[in-house]
C-alpha cells in the first residue's frame, strides 16, 4: 500500500520533516516515490513552517494512497491557509 507520511530530517533537538509518498513496507526515512512538501515544527521568525503541494496530494489520494494521521492534519492546515 502507498502512504503519504512524514520522514524525519534535521539534527538532534531540531527536527525537520519531509512529506513523502512511500510504500508502507519501507523504512520511515527510507526510499520514497515522491516528495510533496515539508514541515518545520521549530520555525522561527520569517522561516516557513509548512509547504505542501496540495494538487499532488489530491492526485495520490485519488490513486488510493492513505494519509498518516499527522500528515492528514498537516494537509488540512495547509488547505485552510491556501
UniProtKB/Swiss-Prot annotation:
Signal sequence region: none
GO BP: translation
GO cellular component: cytoplasm; small ribosomal subunit
UniProt keyword list: Ribonucleoprotein, Ribosomal protein
UniProt family annotation: Belongs to the bacterial ribosomal protein bS16 family.
Single GO MF annotation: structural constituent of ribosome
Presence of keyword Ribosomal protein: yes
Xref: InterPro entries: Ribosomal_bS16, Ribosomal_bS16_dom_sf
Source organism per UniProt: Marinomonas sp. (strain MWYL1)
Pfam families from the UniProt entry: Ribosomal_S16
Entry keyword annotation includes RNA-binding: no
Name assigned to this protein: Small ribosomal subunit protein bS16
